[in-house]
Amino acid sequence: MDCWAFASVCDKVLHNEKDGPLSAAAERNFARLGVRNIRCTRHVVSPDSDDWLKDLRHFAPDWIFADPARRDSAGRKVFLLEDCSPDILKLLPSLWEISDNILLKLSPMADIPMLVSRLGDRLESVEVVSLAGEVKELLCVLRKSHSGEPALKVAELSDTRPFSLDFTKSEEDATPPVYASEIKAGDILLEPSSALLKAGCFNILCARYGLRKLSRFTHLYSAAEDPGIPGAFKAFRVEKTYPFGNAGFKAAGADYPKAEVTARNVPLSSDQLRARLKTAAGGAAHIWACTACGEKMLIACSSI
């Protein structure tokens, strides 16, 4: 699919797949789709072989796209760059001799600070790509001309709730958080998307959208009004708060016999919270157990 998409915007594409049957299947599919500007090769790409390098040099690409295998020889998932196959870090010196631009597609589980450290100053951006709230890929854009800190980009690709945000780690670190002093009925409670959390976007959300963070390690936010960015946040309206403890569990469970529940930054799992509340799953209500405004509490909300 990647090469098929590239072929729609590029003059020509070189597709390499070391697995013979998979390569043959791709070649047949390209032909059936009427794609004529893709050439398929079947090289084993490694620092110890050079057939693939000769082909790549002859092709002279403007961009090199690499999607290394994310499983080891035993079929286990791997997340470190050096554990993927091929090891991109060992190939980079050769790749830079051939092209000025490299795009890597990596596991959504890969650690972004690790990628920034391993890939060095030529890393222009790390892009967290999500669809319908689920992080699908990490894309790393490397350019020979780039030097310095990479941009961190979030992109939600949903047709109905697209969203994008760009920032840098230094901007995040330099932005002071704004903390909520109270949580009351009528407030809007906001849960950031998994893509924002993956990118490490926390304090900037306060500055850019006028939000208040519930506490340092509770990645929930409050606002007087819904910012109206469904691709970035799930929004809830606060109905009532309860103390975190037996009395609060009993009262919240009685008021909300059916609700979704989530524990965040408290010494309970979500399953344990449900057991303490004696609340059945389902319904329009959502009960959060979290640390907020310097104390642990229960926050009962309705979805917006």
What are these regions (language model features)?
Residues 1-304:
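SAM-dependent transferase fold signal centered on methyltransferase-like domains
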